[in-house]
């Protein structure tokens, strides 16, 4: 799957939105990628995650385990693991706490794991997920995502491959361009934010 193929999947699903959005990172953007419009369609999800699995194979070789951050990463992580013939596990957190492997999940010695995300903006969830895996005896070979909207600038502390890399501007609330400030903001994301 090419980057253009993936973006066409987002367009066809009505998942490429324009307006004024508050992202889960707290940053503001004129573009929002509504991944759940993709993941609510099992056939489309299978197609895009098979593309991600092919990219993972090409970059990292065989992997045994796909790890994703809950909740948003569970569906693409599971479907990518299925395409790779790997096991799917996830990290989760108590409210306000760090990510951790629970439910008996582990990355045993000798296992090769990749962290799979849906969309990377700042890389915060990915970094937190990878930090939770450092104590595991298995090898974390790298990270992968459907879309890196940071233009390749997000530093995860691990190699990252993306089906598509976009350079979508994001702004702190106090640095909005006038055309964005003129549009009422909506918050379609999933991560809880602290009131400012």
UniProtKB/Swiss-Prot annotation:
Catalytic reaction(s) noted: orotidine 5'-phosphate + diphosphate = orotate + 5-phospho-alpha-D-ribose 1-diphosphate
CDD domains the record matches: PRTases_typeI
Keywords linked to the UniProt accession: Glycosyltransferase, Magnesium, Pyrimidine biosynthesis, Transferase
Gene Ontology MF terms in the entry: magnesium ion binding; orotate phosphoribosyltransferase activity
Binding site residues for 5-phospho-alpha-D-ribose 1-diphosphate: 117-125
Pathway assigned to this chain's UniProt record: Pyrimidine metabolism; UMP biosynthesis via de novo pathway; UMP from orotate: step 1/2
Binding sites annotated in the UniProt record for orotate: 121, 149
Alphabetized PROSITE patterns for the sequence: PUR_PYR_PR_TRANSFER (PS00103)
Catalytic activity, EC: 2.4.2.10
Primary enzyme class: transferase
Pfam families the record matches: Pribosyltran
SUPFAM superfamilies, per the entry: PRTase-like
Biological processes annotated in GO: 'de novo' UMP biosynthetic process; pyrimidine nucleobase biosynthetic process
Source organism superkingdom: Bacteria
Cofactor: Mg(2+)
Function: Catalyzes the transfer of a ribosyl phosphate group from 5-phosphoribose 1-diphosphate to orotate, leading to the formation of orotidine monophosphate (OMP).
Family recorded in the similarity comment: Belongs to the purine/pyrimidine phosphoribosyltransferase family. PyrE subfamily.
Assembly and interaction partners: Homodimer.
Name listed for the protein in its UniProt record: Orotate phosphoribosyltransferase
Biological classification of the source: Bacteria, Pseudomonadati, Pseudomonadota, Alphaproteobacteria, Hyphomicrobiales
Protein encoded by which gene: pyrE
């Amino acid at each position: 799957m090419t980057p253009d193929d993936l973006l066409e999947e987002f367009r066809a699903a009505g998942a490429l939105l324009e307006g004024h959005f508050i992202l889960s990172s707290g940053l503001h953007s004129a573009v929002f990628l509504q991944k759940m419009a993709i993941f609510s369609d099992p056939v489309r999800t299978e197609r895009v995650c098979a593309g991600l699995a092919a990219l993972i194979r090409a970059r990292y070789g065989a992997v045994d385990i796909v790890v994703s951050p809950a909740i948003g990463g569970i569906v693409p992580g599971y479907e990518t693991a299925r395409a790779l013939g790997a096991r799917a596990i996830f990290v989760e957190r108590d409210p306000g706490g760090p990510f951790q492997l629970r439910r008996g999940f582990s990355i045993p010695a000798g296992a090769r794991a990749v962290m799979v995300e849906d969309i990377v903006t700042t890389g915060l969830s990915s970094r937190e997920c990878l930090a939770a895996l450092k104590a595991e005896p298995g090898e974390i070979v790298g990270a992968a995502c459907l879309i890196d909207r940071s233009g390749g600038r997000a530093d995860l502390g691990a190699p990252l491959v993306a089906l598509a890399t976009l350079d979508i501007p994001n702004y702190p609330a106090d640095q909005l361009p006038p055309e964005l400030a003129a549009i009422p903001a909506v918050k379609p994301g999933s991560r809880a934010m602290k009131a400012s």
